[in-house]
Amino acid sequence: MQGIIFDVQRWSLHDGPGIRSNIFLKGCPLSCLWCSNPESQDKNKELAFFKDKCIGCLCCIKDCHYGAITQGEEERIIDYKICREHCYSEKEHAFSCVKECYAEALKIMGRTTSVEQVMEEVLCDEEIYKKSGGGITVTGGEPFSQPEFLYEILKATKEKRIHTAIESCLFAKWEVIEKCLPFVNFIFMDFKLLDEAEHKKYTGVSNQLILENMKKLSDYKKNHEIDIVVRTPIIPKVNDDVETIHKICDWIVENLPEIREYQLLPYHRLGRGKYANIGKKYEMTELEVPSESKMKELEKQIERHGLIIAKY
């Protein structure tokens, strides 16, 4: 079984208990405007250009079989539409420019790998997981966008008696989610917005399937040992007001009786530079990072609703 990942991040401390390895799968049905990993959205491998590394050797232009790279007045110009048509579908000569870029200014985002190769990588830290109470966290992208690959990773990890976690927006068929649950110890559920129109505006999809899956996970928790935490990224001018968080807390209390932990994650700017690298435009350039006082103000809503402020 093979899938496409774009990173394995070892020694993570923020996506579950203990010390963990985060496995980032490519592909996501959402297109959140603030996404910090835009290279995770496309399910295929894609080209990234790091301008600061380019030495101007012109090898990429000579070796591109599809004419996607040309020389502008000051820098390379990449027609990513041509790349998507020919290279992202991995036709003959796909990403030949990368092979000729000795300065490593051109890179392929994503790599095809097997379950066995993933396990070989994460098992390097097996003793650390056991001593720290850690394990693996499968994230992305959206893990359920590669359901069979995800299932096999989780199954192989549980066979080694290693703790497993998933970070998911839950935009997937329930049957797909349910199949994986016997091999999952911990789930982070992303709850971005309650209002359906707002959710569609900022993520590109309705949230109705997501909300239904949250309810089903709460029901599942009644009879199964599994930790579930709701997570909301706090995005200025989108969901950073008291009323929005108040309504989300109300909904959690009313619809997710088995789930008590809720975590608010402050917006950060770490992913902004990635957009230009893959030929995309970052739409939320004016956003400021939420202040500590703003985050505490919003967290008070969690406590007032009798929920637990989660910290991971």
Specify the residue positions occupied by each region the protein language model found.
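ABC-type ATPase nucleotide-binding domain
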Residues: 35, 104, 190
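Conserved active-site and cofactor/substrate-binding residues in soluble primary-metabolism enzymes
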Residues: 27, 55, 113, 243, ...
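Auxiliary Fe-S-binding modules of radical SAM enzymes
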Residues: 2-17, 222-223, 234-312
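Conserved AdoMet/S-adenosylmethionine-binding subsite of the radical SAM
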Residues: 116-270, 276
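Flexible, acidic/Gly-rich N-terminal and inter-domain linker regions that tether
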Residues: 1-62, 66, 71
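Conserved Radical SAM active-site core
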Residues: 43-183
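Short glycine-enriched, charge-decorated loop/helix-capping segments at active-site entrances
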Residues: 49, 200-206, 279-287
